[in-house]
């Protein structure tokens, strides 16, 4: 491949003799990998049971490198939410955020959902995750991926980050900004990234990233931590971006990432207008380091920073549980029968715990919890999302394995024989992990796996 001329001129000037190293690795085969969803299993369990080659990655304990020609999207474990296809170094920013159960976390540029699913896994169902995506079509992809991964405590929004900052000031312990960028780290994976590259694009992305970073700062609570990342080499979007932000925000300090165990230090010559900026505290992952090209900076807000005034939040009124839902839940998901419900048109929703404290009245909320289902003709019709989130707890289950021929048939949308599940609704699982739900009658399970998700080839 050929680098864009403006990119080549800039990087030759900045890298000198090291440019040849960049060129050599950037023209090699792109790195491939998966991230393991610890809401489903541990990395050790995955490593011990996987049926495809996967080596642990240095970028994150849940990331694995796979063969360049491996495509996980058709694997049953992918359908069951154990895996997210993600080149290994892309897992680093979420890992650096150091999310712990019980925190409130915001991912401001969340689609398609790889890093978001990592944050959700780190929360382990405790605390709250705000997953935002500005582009509506991408927000829908984000919703589908979080549903597949079995995330129960996420509120997904389709908003400008300025609106989030106004509605939810100072409310989050952790904020991730994986900023929209010029994508220079994607050149060897996507030819269109190189074809569309220009200095004007870099300038536009730097301006957009600065705006999002400002809004992220407003969302962060005193003492909270923010990670800013890109998949580009452009100084204006990376070192210079963070240096300028810190110059404007004395309440923030730059955390030293030199001990993170991967990549290389950021470079001061990429922020020449800020001689006091500790570029070496930031982190770069070059193609030679086993990734595609990432930049990361970790910032902490002072504990004594001013806490903004909080808007008054009127808790949403809980929906009265329909008798049909209660009958269904008590039969198949007893622990859910006492959970509060919210109405979402004709659908019923199990709200994300804690979301009643979010000021979302004027925000575009795509999904605020787990879609439970709807009442049709005086019967409760469960949603696919319900089985993906809670299928392992269903009282009526059909257990499959990778080697079971019924697994492939199920993912093609076919009816399968019921070996253990009794008449009525049942969860279908592979190796103990949900693959959706179906309805049993006469020893056969009618397939309710969504048509758009099936392995049809």
Feature-to-residue mapping (PLM):
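Polybasic, low-complexity RNA-engagement segments
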Residues: 1-47, 292-295, 300-457
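A short acidic, Gly/Pro-enriched loop at the edge of an enzyme's catalytic core
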Residues: 100-101, 165-178
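Mobile active-site "lid"/loop adjacent to the S-adenosyl-L-methionine
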Residues: 137, 173-214, 231-238, 263, ...
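Conserved SAM-binding loop of SAM-dependent methyltransferases across substrates and taxa
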Residues: 112-125
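S-adenosyl-L-methionine
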Residues: 132-169
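Conserved class I S-adenosyl-L-methionine
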Residues: 102-111, 130
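Helix-to-beta-strand junctions that scaffold the AdoMet/dcAdoMet cofactor pocket
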Residues: 123-124, 220-222
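Class I S-adenosyl-L-methionine
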Residues: 172, 225-228, 233-349, 354
């Amino acid at each position: 491949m050929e680098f864009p001329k403006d990119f080549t001129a800039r990087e030759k000037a900045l890298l000198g003799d090291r440019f040849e190293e960049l060129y050599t690795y950037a023209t090699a085969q792109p790195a491939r990998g998966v991230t393991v969803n610890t809401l489903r299993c541990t990395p050790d369990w995955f490593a011990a049971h996987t049926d495809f080659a996967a080596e642990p990655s240095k970028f994150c304990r849940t990331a694995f490198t796979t063969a360049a020609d491996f495509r996980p999207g058709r694997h049953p474990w992918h359908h069951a939410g154990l895996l997210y296809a993600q080149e290994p170094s892309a897992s680093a920013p979420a890992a650096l955020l150091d999310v712990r159960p019980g925190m409130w976390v915001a991912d401001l540029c969340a689609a398609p959902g790889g890093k978001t699913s990592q944050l959700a896994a780190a929360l382990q169902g405790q605390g709250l995750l705000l997953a935002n995506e500005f582009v509506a079509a991408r927000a829908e992809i984000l919703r589908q991926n979080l549903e597949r991964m079995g995330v129960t405590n996420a509120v997904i929004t389709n908003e400008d980050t300025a609106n989030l900052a106004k509605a939810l000031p100072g409310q989050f312990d952790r904020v991730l900004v994986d900023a929209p960028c010029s994508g220079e780290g994607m050149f060897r994976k996507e030819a269109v990234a190189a074809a569309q590259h220009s200095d004007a694009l870099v300038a536009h992305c730097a301006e957009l990233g600065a705006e999002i970073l400002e809004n992220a700062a407003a969302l962060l609570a005193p003492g909270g931590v923010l990670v800013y990342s890109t998949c580009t080499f452009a100084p204006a979007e990376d070192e210079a971006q963070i240096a300028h932000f810190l110059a404007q925000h004395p309440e923030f300090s730059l955390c030293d990432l030199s001990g993170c165990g991967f990549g290389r230090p950021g470079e001061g010559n990429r922020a020449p207008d800020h001689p006091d900026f500790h570029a070496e505290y930031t982190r770069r992952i070059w193609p030679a380091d086993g990734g595609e090209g990432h930049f990361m900076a970790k910032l902490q807000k002072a504990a004594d920073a001013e806490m903004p005034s909080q808007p008054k939040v009127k808790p949403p009124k809980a929906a009265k549980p329909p008798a049909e839902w209660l009958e269904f839940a008590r039969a198949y998901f007893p622990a859910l029968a006492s959970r509060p419900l919210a109405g979402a048109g004709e659908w019923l929703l199990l709200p994300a715990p804690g979301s009643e404290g979010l000021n979302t009245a004027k925000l575009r909320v795509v999904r605020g919890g787990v879609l439970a289902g709807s009442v049709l003709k005086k019967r409760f019709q469960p949603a696919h999302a319900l089985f993906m989130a809670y299928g392992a707890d269903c009282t009526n289950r059909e257990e499959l394995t990778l080697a079971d021929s019924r697994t492939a048939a199920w993912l093609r949308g076919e009816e399968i024989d019921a070996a253990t599940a009794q008449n009525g609704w049942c969860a279908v699982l592979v190796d103990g992990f949900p693959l959706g739900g179906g309805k049993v009658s006469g020893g056969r399970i009618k397939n309710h796996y969504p048509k758009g998700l099936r392995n049809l080839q």
